[in-house]
């Protein structure tokens, strides 16, 4: 059963893997990003989203932004050492480990995603296409989501 979702936002970043340190977006939304966006609206182990088509509804425009990011991570080894009686700090002071990074992102994005879903072996006996279709439609109409809907970064929210 096909589902069509219109999404738009001020900014989007579909990061190219070959750009290591600075984020540079693909020109359009990737199928995996569209699948992730739909999963943020409704996720269920008995359902797998399949992207059929992504239509670009606005001109492709880029802009450069600078973002503050935390450069450090808390290592698992450090956590284990403290749990076993060692000493150390188990926090990151964002003000001490902040760095600015440039990103080339898309601006004023607008897409229509055509998708469908397939049932997986993890579906319960009472699960069926009609049930999932109704749940997804209801969640989209009410603006509900399973997790925060965003274009790759939680700081780049989207509207559906």
Language-model segments: residues:
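A short secondary-structure junction signal
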Residues: 123-129
């Amino acid at each position: 059963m096909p589902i069509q979702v219109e999404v738009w936002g001020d900014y989007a970043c579909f990061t190219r893997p070959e750009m290591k340190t600075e984020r540079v977006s693909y020109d359009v939304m990737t199928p995996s990003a569209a699948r992730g966006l739909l999963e943020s609206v409704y996720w269920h182990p008995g359902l797998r989203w399949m992207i059929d088509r992504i239509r670009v509804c606005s001109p492709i425009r880029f802009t450069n932004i600078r973002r503050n990011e935390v450069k450090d991570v808390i290592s698992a080894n450090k956590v284990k050492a403290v749990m076993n009686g060692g000493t150390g700090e188990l926090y990151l002071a964002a003000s001490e480990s902040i760095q600015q990074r440039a990103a080339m992102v898309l601006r004023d994005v607008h897409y229509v995603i055509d998708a469908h879903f397939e049932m997986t072996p993890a579906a319960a006996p009472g699960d069926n296409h009609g049930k999932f279709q109704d749940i997804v439609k209801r969640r989209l109409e009410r603006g509900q989501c399973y997790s925060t809907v965003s274009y790759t970064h939680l700081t780049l929210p989207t509207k559906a």
